[in-house]
Amino acid sequence: MRVLVLGSGVIGTASAYYLARQGFEVTVVDRQPAVAMETSFANAGQISPGYASPWAAPGVPLKAIKWLLERHAPLAIKLTGDVDQYLWMAQMLRNCTASRYAVNKERMVRLSEYSRDCLDELRAETGINYENRSLGTTQLFRTQAQVDAAAKDIAVLEQSGVPYELLDRDGIARVEPALAGVKDILAGALRLPNDQTGDCQLFTTKLADMALKLGVEFRFGQDIQRLDFAGDRINGVWIDGKLETADRYVLALGSYSPQMLKPLGIKAPVYPLKGYSLTVPITNADMAPTSTILDETYKVAITRFDNRIRVGGMAEIAGFDLSLNPRRRETLEMIVNDLYPRGGDLSQASFWTGLRPATPDGTPIVGATGFRNLFLNTGHGTLGWTMACGSGRLLADLIARKKPQISAEGLDISRYGNSREVAKHGQSAPAHQQ
């Protein structure tokens, strides 16, 4: 059985790898010249199941108003006049209740924990190396209010059986020695010892190499134009003016997925959350992070690779704008100077931006659609790296009609209700354009 995977980020590549392991004949198509050239290229490097939390949370609407007035705010909104942007934000606001937050976080943690286990298994089986470390994540709180607010997250961690450790200032210095000199500006921390780190782009490149050995074909530099459909089936995909056919189709196009799906009557509430990162060469290893920290105030992660520090975070709801905002670089540099002032050379840092495909409830869309041979793997937001292996393996099981190792409840697009209006026979308009 032939499967056509659209998109070669970490999600599409993981999907292809696990499908090939199930015995499918897999082809991956992407407009870029190689895998992981867009959102997966320079993310924060964290694999953090315990910190899998939706942006839609109690108190966020009021915080968002406050953040609009702050120079170094973790969230910024640039209204584009796009109806989809307004609808997405309205849906996000509806998910900012305590009850919805608990449901959404459970789904995200469930998939993230499974994904971490899949990654562990993959690493044990293959020896894949991607500058990975398994030294945990430390979430830094600058105020006592942040420490107190962590109680609701700890309750979910306990319910999910995720190990954690609350740290005082001395505890922070113990797990991250380079922070000893600045511990007085911190109020405490929450550490998840089972979290991991690694270079997502490097991982995706090596996973693609392993997929090639399993027979997966990668076709780069090709324009994915539209889906051809009739009734409840996909007939093929128009790629560079030619109709390509398969038995099953997987859409893993990140923020560009809705453009492809809308003509089919599928309303996928995925919208880009623009994020930024700096990659900083290490000049003093003793003054650099040991693993990864998450600054709760600014929603920024600082992660240690072999000889580099990756600083990433923030979110702009600004449509498909990929321009580099110098104020965001200023914020990232400010946080590095605040916490690790002697760790790396900021003058040699590379600045990057990417569009994370976010759903309004934070949970990705993984699974079947109203079309019998079309499957989705998209909407992972800031957690694509964390959820990649689990999402790929889960989807492969679903396509193979095998019972997944975790519950898939609440993960597919049906949770949004009428996800497909009645689609007329015909072809879609062009999509997947930047």
Curated annotation (Swiss-Prot):
GO terms for cellular component: cytoplasm; plasma membrane. Its EC number is 1.4.99.-. Pfam families: DAO (PF01266). Its cofactor is FAD. One of its GO terms (biological process) is D-alanine catabolic process. It is an enzyme of class 1 (oxidoreductase). InterPro entries: DadA, FAD-dep_OxRdtase, FAD/NAD-bd_sf. Keywords: FAD, Flavoprotein, Oxidoreductase. It catalyses: a D-alpha-amino acid + A + H2O = a 2-oxocarboxylate + AH2 + NH4(+). GO terms for molecular function: D-amino-acid dehydrogenase activity. Pathway: Amino-acid degradation; D-alanine degradation; NH(3) and pyruvate from D-alanine: step 1/1. FAD binds at residues 3-17. Oxidative deamination of D-amino acids. Belongs to the DadA oxidoreductase family. This is D-amino acid dehydrogenase. It comes from Pseudomonas putida (strain ATCC 700007 / DSM 6899 / JCM 31910 / BCRC 17059 / LMG 24140 / F1). The gene is dadA.
